[in-house]
Structure formats: C-alpha cells, structure tokens
Amino acid sequence: MGFFVMIRDVSMGFMLLCISALWVLPIQGAGRESFSRNSSSSSLPSSVNVGALFTYDSFIGRAAKLAFVAAIEDINADQSILRGTKLNIVFQDTNCSGFVGTMGALQLMENKVVAAIGPQSSGIGHIISHVANELHVPFLSFAATDPTLSSLQYPYFLRTTQNDYFQMNAITDFVSYFRWREVVAIFVDDEYGRNGISVLGDALAKKRAKISYKAAFPPGADNSSISDLLASVNLMESRIFVVHVNPDSGLNIFSVAKSLGMMGSGYVWITTDWLLTALDSMEPLDPRALDLLQGVVAFRHYTPESDNKRQFKGRWKNLRFKESLKSDDGFNSYALYAYDSVWLVARALDVFFSQGNTVTFSNDPSLRNTNDSGIKLSKLHIFNEGERFLQVILEMNYTGLTGQIEFNSEKNRINPAYDILNIKSTGPLRVGYWSNHTGFSVAPPETLYSKPSNTSAKDQRLNEIIWPGEVIKPPRGWVFPENGKPLKIGVPNRVSYKNYASKDKNPLGVKGFCIDIFEAAIQLLPYPVPRTYILYGDGKKNPSYDNLISEVAANIFDVAVGDVTIITNRTKFVDFTQPFIESGLVVVAPVKGAKSSPWSFLKPFTIEMWAVTGALFLFVGAVIWILEHRFNEEFRGPPRRQIITVFWFSFSTMFFSHRENTVSTLGRFVLLVWLFVVLIINSSYTASLTSILTVQQLTSRIEGMDTLIASNEPIGVQDGTFAWKFLVNELNIAPSRIIPLKDEEEYLSALQRGPRGGGVAAIVDELPYIKALLSNSNCKFRTVGQEFTRTGWGFAFQRDSPLAVDMSTAILQLAEEGKLEKIRKKWLTYDHECTMQISDTENYQISVQSFWGLFLICGVVWFIALTLFCWKVFWQYQRLRPEESDEVQARSEEAGSSRGKSLRAVSFKDLIKVVDKREAEIKEMLKEKSSKKLKDGQSSAENSQSKDHETPQ
C-alpha cells in the first residue's frame, strides 16, 4: 500500500509541474508582499479575493453559482461585516475533470485567494488538497462528501457540507430497521463512489449485515454498460440495491432498471443524496422521471426550516433570471451549503481582521530550484497567515441557512442529519428523519437535540413507505438466485436411529422425521426453493456433526438438515432456525426392583410433618380442655384423670372416635375446625401411602451425573454427537472413561454387560434418542437424575442467511397448526412407552410446606377462642373480687392516679380459683353478690333517712 501511495504522490507532483508550465512569469523577489493597496501592513485591505472551484455545467454547479453570486452581493451590501473591505470571488470551472480541476486550482492560487470554495468533486479534492497544504490556503468544500478526505492528511481541507460517513451510517440504520442482512452496492468507480461504499460496508458489518456484491461502473458509462451490470446483479440473491452515483448521470440507472423489470414488487432501491439533488433541480418535476422512480427511498441532507432559508428560496427565480440560466435549473440543498460557505469565509475574515491580523503572501522557497528548468512557478504564493485564518474558521459558531455552523475536533459539521423521502407519482414525500443523536424519527431533529441521545431500536420510527410495485408491506429483500443453483442440503448418513434422518430410494433420496419437518416448512414459504439433498458420511458409522457444521460454514453446504443439536460453539459459525424438537443430555443406567420396607407406613409424611402433626394433636387437646373445663364434667376431676382425658381426646379425633362431648360454644367451634384439618390430613396420608405401596420401586447404583462422575466407571456416548466433547471439556471427565457406541445394539449390550463385563455403567445421550432406546429395551433401563442440559434440534444455515429467518417462522407456524405433533407421531411413536425416570418415594412424601396454610388458619382460630375465654374469665374475676376500702380509693383519687380503679390488686391465686370453678358456681356467686349489693344499698338509704328525722328543727 505504501508503494502505491508513493507512486500516486510522485505522479501528482509531476502533473503539478506540467500544469504550471502553462504559464511562465517573471521571477519576483522572495520577500513578503502585502495584499493591501496603498496602505500599511497594519491596516485593512481594500479587497480580498476568494476562489470558487466547481463544475459549471452540472446540477450542483448551476445552483452553486447562483448561491455564490447572491452571497457576495449580500456580504458586500452588509455594512456590519468586513467594513471597508470588499470581498471578490474568482470562479474556476473544473469541468468534471481531475486534470482541468487541478489546473483551475493553480490558476486560483495565481489570484492570491485567501480561501477557495470547493471543489465540488471528491476526486479533485484529493488532488488539490496537496496544493492547499503546500500554500496554506484553506479549501472549503460545499459538495465533496468523500469520507476519506481526512483532516489529518489534508489539514487545509474543510468540509462545509456533511461527511458521507454519516450518510452511510444512516443507510445502514435503515437496512437494519427493516432487518435486511445483505445489500448490493451500485456505485460510480471513482474516489467518491468507492470510498463511500467502503464506509457503508464497514457500517453494515457492525450491524451483522454485509454488501453481498459491489457493482461498479466507470464515470460516463453508457446505457449498454449499465444494462449489462444490472442484468448481472439481478441474477443474485439480494434485492436491496444501494445506489451511490453522481446526480447528472444517475437517472440512467433507473431507466435501464425499469426496462429490465427491476422496479417491480420485491425490489428495494435506496439512493444517497444525489437523487434528490437531481429531482430538486428539475423545475417543474419531470413526470417521466417520477414514473421511473416510484417506490425509491432517497436520502437528502437535512437543513432546518427558517425565515432566512425561505427568503433565500424566494429570491431564486430572480437570481436565475439575472444570471440568464435555463428556466428548468431548480433549487437544491447544495445551493444552501455554497451560500453558507461564502458567508463562513466572510465572517471568519471579519474576526481575523478584528484580531489585528493581516493578509500577506510570500514565495514558496521549495520551488526556487525549479527556476533553472524553465518552468516558472513564481506565481504560486504561500498565504503566510493561512494557518491562523484556518483556525479562525474552525472556531466559528453561528446559525446559517443550513443550520448551526460549527465544527467538531475532526473538522466535521456538528449535528449531521438527513431527510428520508419516498418517491411517489406526485413527487418525493418525507417519511422521517435521521440524525446521529436520535436515529430515525418523524419529528425534526432540532426539536430532539435538547433531549438525551437515544438510538435504541425500540424507539426508532418512520412513516409508512410505498415500495416499488406500490406495495405497502416491506419486501423480504432477497430471492433465490436466478442462476439455476439449487440449495445444497447436507444430511447426516446415520447408521443408528434412522427414523430421524437416513438414506432412501424416494425422489428426495432421504427420509425421516427431520426431513419431513424441513419439507413441511419449505412448503409454507411464499417462494419456491430449488434444493438437492446430499448425504454426509460413509454409512458405516455416524458422521461427525461438528464437521458437518464446519462444511456449512465453509460454503460446501448451504444448510444442514437432520438431528443437529443447537449448542453455543456451533452458533459462532452458522445460524440455526427455531428448534423443532426439545433435547438435552440425560443419564441412562440399569435398574432393579426395590424390596418393600416394613416401615413404609411412615413414608407418606416427612419427619417434620410427623412432628408438627403430633404437636398439633396435643395442643388441640389442651385448648379443648381449657375451654370445656368449666362447663363439662367429663373434663373435670383429679389431675391424673384430666391429663389422660386430654391425651385420649386429642388422638381419638384422628379417627373421629372421641367419646367426650363438647358443651361450650368456643369448644365446639375449635373442634369443628380441627376435625376439618384432620379430615384433610387423613385423606392425604391415605393417598400418599397408596401411591408408595402400588408404584413399582426401582433402584440404581447410579443416581445421577454427580455419582457417575465420582464412580470412575466407563461411560457410553453415541458416536458423532457433541456428548463426548461436553463430558470432557465441561465436566472434566477423563477421555479414557468415555466409550463411543455405534448403534442401539451396542447401547443395550454395553448396559447389560456392565463395567465388570466390559460394558458401561451408564450412557449419556440426548433425550430423543433415549426415548427410542428405552422403548426398544422393553423398559429394562431408566434415566437417573435430572436432565442436565436443555437445548433443541434445528436446521443450520450459513451465517446471515435470510432463509434461516423465514424457516424459523415456518416452523413456528407448523407448531401452532399442530403439524409438528402429527409428524412426530408418524415417526416417533413407540410400541412400549416407558416411564423415563426412576420413581422416588420422596416424590410422594407430604411436607409441612403443603399444609402450612391450613395449620395457620387452625392456629388463628385457637388464638381467637383462647383470647375470648381469657377475657371472659378476667371480667368475671373483676366482678367477684372483694371491695376495696374507701380509704384506699380516697388515696388513689388524691394522688391523681391515671389508672384510677386499675390499681386494684390482682391475686393470681384468686384468679386461678375463678378459672377452676364451674360456670354454674360463678353465675351463682355473681347473683349473690348482686343481691348483697342491693340490700346494702337499701340499708344505707334507711340509715340516712333516720338521721334526717333525728336532726333538731
């Protein structure tokens, strides 16, 4: 690469020397020349020259020339800027030629310009940027969008329009928005086209998309060349075309595409800003052009609406008439950038002069040695203050017709944004915007800059687009190539479990469960898929599935169809469809019947359940005794008798055979709730015990993967599957312990012989295979432990294949319609359906966790009943206690006690006596106390009356 760069620079230097020989001028002194006229170096010059380098006869050039003229008039008429200094503009035509453009740039340098507006062409920009670097003259390009015009390589090249780096990222986001994976790039084969498409390819790669083909044609290609190019890309798979060409010749592409039938349904055409430049320049719009372009999506540099912009567009007709241009030369966005570029130079000069800087030029000392050769380069002067002037330009920050004019550290305009337009029969219609701040939106970008940056996929939004063929639904974006090549399908040539995939004599050449699912999914696709099945393997042993996946990734096969397991390592090389059957690794081991245990009757409950249940029986007996003791003679008597009664009553409720009757309301309520709990416990115990005694109990030495790893005994795996690598790499099992087995017969033989007979202790394989194995073994074996990987089988396609997405959708549709189950029953129905796992008695045990809600309800009822009982007893005790003396009451009142009557002493011994008394006795005592109080009250009244009579009159 360095060699080619060196050759290019040498060639460029030689060309510059040849061009300079076109004029030979007297040698001037090497001293500095002041640009000012009749003034000292410290005063402002009376005029300053600015160059303009562009192609006159082009859509962009015609609009730019009007903008340049308007800008110069406005600047010189504005007394607030460049006071006393006139700005002159020197035009130079590049004629779309690198040679002529370079010559024109040198002629501009002859006029001692302080800056040059242009060039229009990116190719010319690469050449003349070397001139700018040498002579320190800033070039401000309003139309060269090539992203490789680097600010590091070309420090004096400044872009006042947007960098195509952002436009290519916008197109990439558009492709990603519709989930397309491949595009065809059609571009002009020059610096502008090649470099822009190169950036597009890099941007697509970041989104897991790609350019499937780059279709380049030379500048100025005729329709015949374009037709041959489009005919070749039409044979390819992708139907997404990104067109990046020049506006003056780009419409020919769509004219040819229309004749080839490439503008109909299923096609997607995306263009960069060139198309809207061409259409905007047509006044009025050509109906024939719109007819060609219906459904095309085009990008355009976004410029915010403003009063100044509207006023400038309103002047356009007068400007065109003044310059005697054709009536159909319309306004386009590059006119705005050209206008702003001139104003940028003027404003920068104003700041430059206000800082006390001057404009001076000097001869280039590096060109002195060329004088003796006869080639005179003395008119190429260095702008001495060019570096400072460039810095002033980069520091400018104001609002122009194109929006905020400010440059970032990479010398790009800030806030890049684009319009997205859909071409319809009535003209272009905006469907949204793109900016690097928010991605796609339907609101103008400047209204979103105040919000945080957000480019997440879920927040992207565009309005409805009408695609070619007047289709509303977004096209799929690809078809099968029209070059006659069918889909190459690799099918594993299995020697075992042939009902999944195997060789056959039918027209397809293969058959099986996986083949039927693939064929059923293919039939659901809305397009034909030519295909051919190719067996993979020698038929003597199962092939390596990892090798099959590698051949798909290497483009030997387009897809692998069969019992291919989806695992992480394989997804790095291929794309899998939605799984069509669940799978996972399990352990199969020999089993034998277990002997019945004499303690089986204890197995229905866990130890915790037995303990909690026993405690509850005792507790309910105590609660019933407390509630019934005062009412029921059966719960009274000597302490020994009462303890026996509590125990007997508690456990007899288990069988609903308690002989004691409950009398109190609270006791009956508690017993009712408890009997319901007992009913549930009894029923659950009976059901669990029945299951334990009736289900066949099987045992195995191997309880799962953990015991298998610890046993150091041989393990069998199916030859060709990923199980071997999983055991070795993930579980760190020694390879010497793993024995590959070829078919079902070897499986059964190895399990029956066992480790001592040269067999295996267990087999590790995928679940679908194990179901078939257990059925064919008459259920002599069982899986032990749990399934320790969970995955599935899918079809493996090449990376980024769009067919994988469509097939996944078809598989989901098969599942929803029940067709997957029908195919499964056709191929995977076995004579003996075996229970997969060994039944464990622990699975039938009932724990406290299953009953904690019921026990909680029971406890709450008991608590409420005991609370009501205690409240009643305390109330009775308060009424039966002896009356306190008046002196105690008086002392309490004098002390101001807040508790008042609550200071009465409570004797625990007296309280227990009240609790132990019969309810009838308590009621009798309360009645007697009430009568006594009544009599005492009457006596007090009589005594007071007698005292009143004895009082002297």
Curated annotation (Swiss-Prot):
Glycosylation-annotated residues: N38, N95, N223, N371, N397, N436, N454, N569
Recorded topology in the membrane: Multi-pass membrane protein
Position of the signal peptide: 1-29
Keyword annotations: Glycoprotein, Ion channel, Ion transport, Ligand-gated ion channel, Membrane, Receptor, Signal, Transmembrane, Transmembrane helix, Transport
SUPFAM superfamilies xref list: Periplasmic binding protein-like I (SSF53822), Periplasmic binding protein-like II (SSF53850)
PANTHER family membership: IONOTROPIC GLUTAMATE RECEPTOR
Entry function: Glutamate-gated receptor that probably acts as a non-selective cation channel. May be involved in light-signal transduction and calcium homeostasis via the regulation of calcium influx into cells.
Gene assigned in the entry: GLR3.5
GO MF annotation list: calcium channel activity; glutamate receptor activity; ligand-gated monoatomic ion channel activity
Any single Pfam family the record assigns to this protein: Lig_chan-Glu_bd
Tissue: Expressed predominantly in roots. Also detected in shoots.
Cytoplasmic side: 628-636, 658-668, 872-953
Residues spanning the membrane: 607-627, 637-657, 669-689, 851-871
Stretches of the chain found on the membrane's Extracellular side: 30-606, 690-850
This protein's name: Glutamate receptor 3.5
Classification lineage: Eukaryota, Viridiplantae, Streptophyta, Embryophyta, Tracheophyta
Family per record: Belongs to the glutamate-gated ion channel (TC 1.A.10.1) family.
One Gene Ontology term from the biological process aspect of the record: calcium-mediated signaling
Region span, Disordered: 928-953
InterPro entries assigned: ANF_lig-bd_rcpt, GABAb_receptor_plant_PBP1, Glu/Gly-bd, Ionotropic_Glu_rcpt, Iontro_rcpt_C, Iontropic_Glu_rcpt_pln, Peripla_BP_I
Self-association state and partner proteins as the record states: May form heteromers.
Location of the protein in the cell: Membrane
